[in-house]
Amino acid sequence: MVPLMAVYWLVYDRESQSTAAQAQITAGWGGAQVLTGPVLVLPYVANVTRTETINGQDRTSVVRERRELFVAPSTQRIETTIAPDRKGYAIYESVVYDSAMSGTARFDWPAELARLDVDPASVLADQAQLRFGVSDPRGLKDGARVEVGGTALALQPGNGPAATGGAGFSAFLDWTARQPLAVAWRYGVRG
């Protein structure tokens, strides 16, 4: 007869070793991935009224505050290829993948800025930004490229959308023309 605690300990030990083995296998691949974007971010300046109490007196002031308006693409097409593979470590096995993503998106100038309480004159269109989210950037592969109107943009790490905890990559662009924006992109992820 085997004591119940010995069985419990054996199961716990194997689970711990399995978790450690999976971490070892996927160390160079990146973990589970959440991918988002592209999202176009338009910064703007808003006048915000603030009231604070100083020595029992209410004081109201108007402060200029920088905010961000997130614009989703009006149309988007995405193509993804995924090549799964099994990697092993001792008696443990884990599935990893290598993926390639490409797509196009079209952004139109937001027509309802007034409804969103955004003054069109306060939009800093010359500081617009495209953001792509990759939750575990260790898995990003070389060769990422983002083009607007056929011109490649300089990519920067980080500053992804909130859905990926700010992880990912981004690119600044000038949208002062306020004409439809054609974006093409491609990048690869391992996970």
Which sequence ranges carry the predicted segments?
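Short, well-ordered alpha-helical packing segments
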Residues: 7-8, 22-26
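Elongated amphipathic alpha-helical scaffolds of membrane-associated proteins involved in membrane
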Residues: 4, 29-36
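Hydrophobic alpha-helical transmembrane signal-anchor segments
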Residues: 1-13
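Short, structured protein-protein interaction patches enriched in aromatics and acidic/basic residues
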Residues: 44, 48-49
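Soluble non-transmembrane domains of integral membrane proteins
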Residues: 16, 20, 27-28, 37, ...
